[in-house]
Amino acid sequence: MEIIKITPRGYCYGVVDAMVIARNASLDKTLPRPIYILGMIVHNKHVTDAFESDGIITLDGPNRLEILEQIETGTVIFTAHGVSPEVKRRAKEKGLVCIDATCPDVENTHTLIRRKKADGYHVIYIGKKGHPEPEGAVGVAPDIVHLVENKQDIEQLPESLNDQKLIVTNQTTMSQWDVKHLMEDLEEKFPHIEVHKEICLATQVRQEAVANQAPSADVLIVVGDPKSNNSNRLAQVSKEIAHTEAYRISDISELKLEWLEGKSTIAVTAGASTPTPIVKEVIDYIKGYDPLNITPIPETSGVPVDKILPKIKNAAPVKILD
């Protein structure tokens, strides 16, 4: 069986930066305890479990402000997905020490929204409802940001927006093809709209790699957490653009033998928040797959927790929000 290891795949710089920030926080004895992460630092349960073993508590839920109310004292880390100004204000009001691990690409979108609001614009934001990144972006200026996820949402936007200065931007981890189609629909409805595509480069090149390399495979395995939007989009790109069957799995335990049976070429990629050892475990199993002598798929991943987080040789001081 041939294996195509899609390149690039796995960790992006924003994820690595966020994990290093949280790891440094766990090693900084001057920070008040407990240390909480407001949501999943990145969307991967293996990573959040590893931080739990490091003494950092992950609090997750659909709304950052509601989660924040569970915290009375200590330190709070904002995740790579970004948070609204209201969350930051409330955390300071509660007397919490705040550390910001927002991805720079997400922060760029927040800056764009702030700037356009100051210039009198309304913003149409393409994103996945219920995902923390749109929650934070909409929260930058909730009075002028309109969240849309699909064509039906666009149809429901008021015609009165034609009388407003208008831009469209997007969640950084969306499918670039979905965003393109939705932006075209918006340009048709609002001909004067300014287009600001904000798909991050890491997401873009990983999607393009799948589009270009997956057609050579019989099936694509995407290793990524179910909450990881960029992982789910990789599977979508494989099916819709590369026309290759695709399955997303969290780790080796979710791999199915029937996906491998009768196949000659298997491609493997990974979401931007998937630990490299978790991906390697999947690749190693597929490499060793023998239809005449099948090794049972493990019920759980065998990757030790201490192999998940980045190694910190010299802990750096943690930058605390003013």
UniProtKB/Swiss-Prot annotation:
Q: What is its EC number?
A: 1.17.7.4
Question: Does the keyword Acetylation feature in the UniProt annotation?
Answer: no
Q: Where is the active site?
A: 133
Please state the span of the N-terminal signal peptide per the UniProt entry.
none
The reaction(s) annotated as catalysed by this protein in its Swiss-Prot or TrEMBL entry are: isopentenyl diphosphate + 2 oxidized [2Fe-2S]-[ferredoxin] + H2O = (2E)-4-hydroxy-3-methylbut-2-enyl diphosphate + 2 reduced [2Fe-2S]-[ferredoxin] + 2 H(+); dimethylallyl diphosphate + 2 oxidized [2Fe-2S]-[ferredoxin] + H2O = (2E)-4-hydroxy-3-methylbut-2-enyl diphosphate + 2 reduced [2Fe-2S]-[ferredoxin] + 2 H(+)
Which cofactors, by name? Answer: [4Fe-4S] cluster
Give me any GO biological process, just one.
isopentenyl diphosphate biosynthetic process, methylerythritol 4-phosphate pathway
The record's similarity note reads: Belongs to the IspH family.
This chain belongs to the protein called: 4-hydroxy-3-methylbut-2-enyl diphosphate reductase
Lineage here is: Bacteria, Bacillati, Bacillota, Bacilli, Bacillales
Which gene is annotated as encoding this protein in its UniProt record? ispH
